Amino acid sequence: MHKFKIRFFLLFFFIVPIYSDSEFSVMTLNVNNLFDELDDPKKDDKAYLPIELKQSKKHINSCMKIRVNSWKNECLNLDWDKDTKNAKLNNIARDIVAYDEDGPDILALQEVENENILRQLFNLIEPFGYIDYVLIESRDYRGIDTAIISKFKVLDSRLHYIKFSGEFEDKDTRPILDTTIEIKDKKLKFYNVHFPAGYHDVSMRIDSLNKLKSLLKKHNMPSVALGDFNVNTEEDSELFIYKDQEDLWDVAHLSGCENCKGTYYYSYGKSWSFLDTIFISNKRNIDYVPNSINLHMTKYNAYADTGKPIRFNPIKRTGVSDHLPMVAKIRIN
């Protein structure tokens, strides 16, 4: 009997992670236009409205000015009613909590319209241990902001706008969401980013990364930066953009995720890119838990044969986003 107890103790000792009390998990997910169904006159949400609100001449004329045909058709014909919106919310929530049984400890979202829709998502996943959320309305006219949902208390948050160089100095873009969260009696910084899209000059993404570095240098707190960096494989291969961050940051997909193709698939170029990734600060007493960096892929958000993201289909009400979520576990030393 004593031998059994000893063996059980040794088995338990070696199975239970030594650092489990000092670990937390993160997920970053671009939710691809998560809008409510209400008209906000201060934001460009005209594509995401119920069809009955799209019948006026004013609305139709506004849509006809859109140059991209798919966006124009969406503006004219998409019926973004309450049921469709709820279907997207439920699909997102289902995939979030499918990670690690009850969802990540810290969830960073991009392309969230406002606090109203964020609160609705929070209410769906709150039973899984989430206690706080934050979204600060930015100047972005498109109405797609960054947000945090957390199982730990958010202490403070603010926005940092990015000043671009050269001919783009007057360009405005989405700011960096800076959030301080207390985890295991330690304060950590989280930077949620959504940098300029690929049709903008690459210098704007590099300026954004330099801004992120400057924020990190202003303090000594352990820090996590995550989100949609919008750096594609072509420009990264040429300019080593992610590699150049390693003086201050440990870049998730360069440190792990060995079998990951990317978080976004470009159909026209038939290529994968890590638009979305996770950084943690170097030499600040945090590191990645080995083998924890991955893409969170389910049968609902990725095709089984190709791994490509399944974007939300408002007719079938299936799918989640055109981006795959990246996840990691981080250890506080």
What are the residue ranges of the model-derived segments?
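Sec-dependent signal peptide recognition
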Residues: K3-L11
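Hydrophobic h-region of N-terminal signal peptides that target proteins for export
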Residues: L10-S20
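N-terminal, active-site-proximal structural segment of metallo-dependent hydrolase catalytic domains
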Residues: I18-L124, S138, Y300
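Metal-dependent phosphoester-hydrolase catalytic domains
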Residues: S25, S214-V224, N230-N333
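Active-site beta-strand/loop signature of hydrolases that rely on acidic residues for catalysis
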Residues: V26-V31, C75-D81, K85, I92, ...
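Solvent-exposed loop/turn segments at secondary-structure junctions
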Residues: V31-F35, V112-N116, S138-R142, K153-L155, ...
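Extracytoplasmic, non-cytosolic globular domains
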Residues: K43-D45, L107, V134-L135, S165-G166, ...
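Structured beta-strand-rich core segments of catalytic domains in phosphoester-bond hydrolases
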Residues: I106-A108, V112-K187
